[in-house]
Each structure stands twice: as structure tokens, then as C-alpha cells.
Amino acid sequence: MKSAEIREAFLRFFEEQGHTRVASSSLIPNNDPTLLFTNAGMNQFKDCFLGAEKRAYTRAVSSQKCVRAGGKHNDLENVGYTARHHTFFEMLGNFSFGDYFKRDAITFAWTFLTSEQWLNLPKEKLWVTVYATDDEAYDIWTKEVGVPAERMVRIGDNKGAPYASDNFWTMGDTGPCGPCTEIFYDHGPDIWGGPPGSPEEDGDRYIEIWNNVFMQFNRTADGVLHPLPAPSVDTGMGLERVSAVLQHVHSNYEIDLFQNLLAAAAKAIGCSNDGQASLKVVADHIRSCGFLIADGVLPSNEGRGYVLRRIIRRACRHGNKLGAKGSFFYQIVAALAAEMGEAFPELKSQQAHIERVLKAEEEQFAKTLEQGLRILEQDLAQLKGDVVPGDVVFKLYDTYGFPMDLTADIARERELTIDEAGFEREMDAQRERARSASAFGMDYNSLVKVDSATEFLGYDATEAQGKIIALYKDGQAVDQLGEGEQGVVVLDRTPFYAESGGQVGDTGFLQAGAARFDVRDTTKTGGAFLHHGVVASGALVIGSPVEAKVDADVQHATSLNHSATHLLHEALRQVLGEHVQQKGSLVDSQRLRFDFSHFEALKPEQIKQLEDIVNREVRKNTAVETELTDIETAKAKGAMALFGEKYGDTVRVLSMGGDFSVELCGGIHAKRTGDISLFKIISEGGVASGVRRIEAVTGAAALAYLNAAEEQVKEAAQLVKGNRDNLIDKLSAVLERNRQLEKQLEQLQAKAASAAGDDLSNAAVEVKGAKVLAARLDGQDGKALLALVDQLKNKLGHAVILLGSEHEGKVVLVAGVTKDLSSQLKAGDLMKQAAAAVGGKGGGRPDMAQGGGVDVAALDQALALAVPFAEQGL
């Protein structure tokens, strides 16, 4: 059976057993901030197992894409060198949420594996482990399923603590836990290794193919296990492992799926496909990289983006080792999409995006890869011992972009190790250097803890009656706030929108009789809305009734900008591609700021397209509609949810232009798209690797921006004695005239330099048979000095030259050495000394170098270094 057939058979089998087929979740966990990547099938069902989430089904089956690279679960260093380690793998799993338990889970697994209708594995090849004290599971296996006792193994607490066992699963120190039973396949006596639980269990003969976890206890802090009222089942079977069994091969890299990727990798690199570890690395890494990029991760220097960058660069290094010339990795994406695109359509829909991202990253790394490898070779040649020092590893990381594990990979091939502790010390020192020395004041608002909740009325009103239920000053609860005091007011009900989803909190005021509180910001903690501000008059007391009034004009302007971000988001996806995801936003009354995932700067025509699309929707003047529904229904309607956001049982779906833009959002918005009036992008740029930022204005602010631009056009026209109609022609004429004058100036400077050269050559002194000339020519730029040094080298014939100039308040230096002397004296070395003397830097070739500095007063001192430099080197 092919891998795709095994996947489909598994899903179909459990559907026939009453399970709901659930699509794989993203590799970016959206409900677990502790998890770097999705690494197991149960991740998306975690809240179901904890009882925090109820779904319409109690039985589920899935084929989950998983990544283990970085963080606690990290297989990266072993990938390519073993038969079964991968950065990406598929986990087939069936799950029960308080439905069936051990008997059915065991029966399902055995039936699927051994039945002639399904996988038809020979029963005598299968071994089973259970937790040492799990007699229930043992009896089901031996008495009901019929597994002989000689192929049953009880595994106890083999990890040094109670319930610390390969066959006892825990979610943490406390919480749901329980025993598990694992099924192993015996590859036969030709392969070394012993059965599970034996001293030789780490061999490759007996391979685990399926794990059934029985969540039947809740462990409390005292270590006591309490039975759960509704036990559950979580299982996992690696698709690659079971494919190897069914295709009668020992290594996962020999299965059909990998054979196709290995062939594509060999073709892209231009090497033979004969089982090299490096080729396996490339074939494995294209899967993790392709899927991560499809799920919204982009290469960067932190978090998930850095893990992706590490994997890409490891693949590039192994391709380089195999002889790859130029970019090759991105060329394998087509084979990946062909192999796995039917099961995971995102690979096909985002193929072009994945290729662009990989190619850009490859090209960036290629600039330093060769140089970094040469530096490493030099350091290894001088190495005494078998440990690469931490400072060398750090230099490669900091200067040449080599992740630590890439250097470790190279060291491993030479039977060397790296000094990880030394590398971390260098990293800590760098962080300390970068850490700001600024002292920050206490954020008292972070101390505010409120048990009460506030009823929000702001979707329908900007004014409301309420009552003060809590007051805070400097983070501490108080009974009243007096005139002039700053603090926080909590009401039982409010029309003020609290900062969320990028939209700033509302401003306005609270009136309590003669007392007035100016609200400068509104935030939220738990269910309570915090009104931050100052008492303008009178005093506020807990229990007092208040009239809450939002600054409606400011809120309205903010709402227009918020609605515009939704239109912009969809426009970006249409113009740039579906890989675009929101990475952050800030919406206030003045402008909007929208951060999104993209790998390159936008072209002017793309920015114009975005403006045209958004303004087209604005002119349609369609109603902005909202609907409250459950998350699954919202997603079925195509509503975009933000990665990393946690959504409750009920979500608010906001639609614009019919189905043009459909997003989950709790913010304040325009009533109709026409209220936005006008949308204008005012800037676009990068804020991080793979993240771009657009700033834009709407409504009156957009009109003001265009009016200001019109005034600038008028002023420019007046400066060149033209008008709006002929401004471009006038400016072109001015620029052309300027180019002509610059050319004439260069010619005059060249003549002056030539004349100066004749005079300067007479000022050279002789040092050990060579002419040495150091001279100061203030007012000359670097270009003029370079030309003059070339001229002087020709005139003097056997010479060392150092020229300096004060130009626009800074020092400019140029050094030259005639070729017959450049093996003894290097211009770059002279420049380093001279530039350092004027507080700057410099360098260059052995025969010509440039530099500069900021200490004009030290220029003469720097020039005086030329003679002793020549004396020492000749």
C-alpha cells in the first residue's frame, strides 16, 4: 500500500466505527502558548480532554501534520542520520472524549492492523506493552484479543519516579494522566535489537507503530491519582513508520513518499540518489519548511521563524555539501505539492509563495555560506582537541548566520563536538550589551485585580447610565478619588470600548453629579472594563451613579480606520496571495497601522492596486453586518480567524461587501463601507524579517493628506517657475542642468587634482628605496582622492601613498600601494591604522583602500603614520 492509501484507509476505518473525520489543525497551535509547534494529534483536542470544550462529537479521527524541531521536542540533529527521525511527520490518531475506553480502543487498533480487509499485518510480528499495573489492558490483550503472553511486556516506572514510565502518560505534574499500551512491529532477526523492556530495546528490530493512551486519572499536587468521571482515549500512529512496515522496508526514507522527494532533491542538486545522509536531510526538510510556510511562518531571527530559518539553512548546507550550485531547495516544492497536495491542499494553493520564500532565504544565506565554511575550516585546522570553542560557534552565528545546530552538524561529521555552554555565554553577553540601561517606572495598572464584570453597551450607544463598582489609585483599591487624582474607575455597565484587537480604547468622560472624571483610555482585565483618567472636578465614590459619555467623534474616526483594516486585509490577500496573515495592528482616530506576513517590499503598482480595491468597496457603500455564532459555523462561512487568538464558544462575525471580507472581530466599526469616504496608503515598509507594515488614513484625515500633497505640488511648481501641468518637464530640465554642472565640476576637479599631483609628487620622501607620500587636501571627496592616488602611483612608480581630506565636517582617507610593493605592504593595513587614529574604520585591497572618521583634529596625526608604516614593512 502507498502512504496515501494507508492514510485514507485509517480515516475511513474509524469513520465506519462512528468517528468524525477532523481536518489537521495548523502547525501553529492556537490554543496553547506553551507549544512551539503542533507535535501530536491530540494538541487540537486538548481542551476537549480537559473538559473545557464540548464538541458535537465524542469520537474523532484525524491525520495531523506535526513538526518536532526546536523547543522540548527537537529531532533536528538526528534527521538524516537515522531511519526514523524527522522534522515533519504525520500522526494518525483516533480519539474518544468520554465515550469508549480500553476495550474498544484495543479492539479497533488490532482489527485495523491485522484484519485482511485493512492492513493485514501478520499477528505473530506484533508485540504489545502495557503499564506494569494495568491488569485491565493486559487481560483484554491476552484473554480477548488473544496476544500470547510471550509477546506481552509489562513496563514499570523506568524513569526514576512514580508513574514516570514509557507506558504512563501525563500532561504535566498535575492534571489528566493514565497508562498507555503500545504496539511494536518485529522487523526480524536480520536487524539488531531486542524487544521492548529488554537491554537491547534501543535497537531497530522492534519498532513502535501505535500508542494508545488511556486518560483515566487526574493527578493532584500531592501525587495522588483520582479516577476521572469520564475516561478518554488518545492514540497515535506514525504514518511514515507504518508505511515502512507495509512496504517491507526498514527505513522511513525508503517508503514511496520519500523516494519521490529524494529523486526530486537529487535532480535539483545535480547529484546521484544513492542514500547519502545529506540527501535525506534535504528530502525531510522540504516537508517541514513547505508546511510551516503554508501555515504562515516566515524565516526570521526569533521564535518559530528562527526554527524555520535553521531548518532551511541546514538543508542549504547539506545541498552545498552534495555539490549544489546556486539555489536548489525551492525547486523541490513542486514535488512536495504533487506528493502530498491531495491530502493537504494548502501545499498546492500556496506553492508559488512557498517557492518564493525559500528562494529568497537561500539567496540570502548563499552570500555568507561559502565564506562561513572557509572560516570554520580555518578554525578547525588550528583546533587542539575535539571541542569547537563557543566563541567560534558564536562568531559563525553572529557574523555568517550559521545557527548553532548547523555548526554542530558540521562538527559531528568530523567526530567533534561544540562547546554549547561557551556559545550560550557569548549569547548572554550579547544580550547584556543590547539590553537597555533605562529604568522603567512601575505600571500600577498591571496590579489592578477585579472580580466583578462590566456589561458592554458600546455596539449600540455612546452614552449610558452606570454605577461605580470599584476605584483604584496606583493599583490599589480605594473608596474614593479626589479632584486632581489619577486612577481607574470600574462601572457595572459602560459604552466605552476597551482596547482590544488593535483598536485603541475609547476616551470621553464620566459625570457623577458635580464630579467629572476625564477618561483618557479604556482597557480590560477579565470581564471588567477599566476607565483610566483623572478627576477633573469633585470626587468619585464607590456606589455613585454616573453618566458615561464616549467622545463620539474620536470613536467614529477610529471605527472608520478599523473597518478599513478589514478591507485592506482582504485586498492584500487578493493582490499578494493567500499567504498574507495579520501580524499586528494599531487603529486610532488619526490613522491605521497594519502589519502582515510578506517576504518583500511592495511595488508601487501593488500599492495602487490595494488602494483601488479598498476604495472600490468604499464606493459600493454596502452595509457592515455583524452576527453572533459558534466558531465552527463562522469558519464554515469563511471567516478569518487570527493565529494565536483564543476564541470563546460564541464569536462575532463581521462582514463587509457581502462576502468580500468576513472576519472574527469584536471591535467598533462603521455602519456602511461608504462612511470611510476615502482610503489612502501613506507608507509601506519592513518591521521584521518576513513582516511588512502599511500605514494609511481614511475619511477627513485622507482628504487632509491629499490637500497637503496638493499644496506641496503647488510649492514645487512655483520653485521651478511652472505649474501643475508642466511640473514634470520643468523638474526634468532642472535635474538635467544639474547633471551637466556636476559633470563640469568633476572635470574641473580632475584638472585641479592633476595639477596638485604634479606638485605633490615632489613632496614624497624616500624610505628604503620607495617613495612615501602623505598629504592633506581639504575639500576633496573620496572619489577625487581615489583618482589622485591612482595618478600618483603612476607618477611615483615605487610608492606608498596616504591622502586625507576634511570634507563636509568629516575625515576622508585613501591609501595606495604600487603593485610591486603590495606583497610587503598592504594598503588595507595602513588604512586601518590611519582610520583608527581619526575615530573611524577603513579597509580595502592590498593596493588600494578607503576609510574615514569623525576626529578632524587628528587628521595630521593620522597622515604622519605613513612613513613609520613603510619603514616597518620594508
From Swiss-Prot:
Zn(2+) binds at H562, H566, C665, H669. Pfam families: DHHA1, tRNA-synt_2c, tRNA_SAD. PROSITE patterns: AA_TRNA_LIGASE_II_ALA (PS50860). Its cofactor is Zn(2+). GO terms for cellular component: cytosol. The keyword Zinc applies. Its main location: cytoplasm. It is found in: Cytoplasm. It is an enzyme of class 6 (ligase). NCBIfam families: alaS. Belongs to the class-II aminoacyl-tRNA synthetase family. PANTHER family: ALANINE--TRNA LIGASE, CYTOPLASMIC (PTHR11777:SF9), ALANYL-TRNA SYNTHETASE (PTHR11777). This is Alanine--tRNA ligase. It comes from Pseudomonas putida (strain GB-1). The gene is alaS.
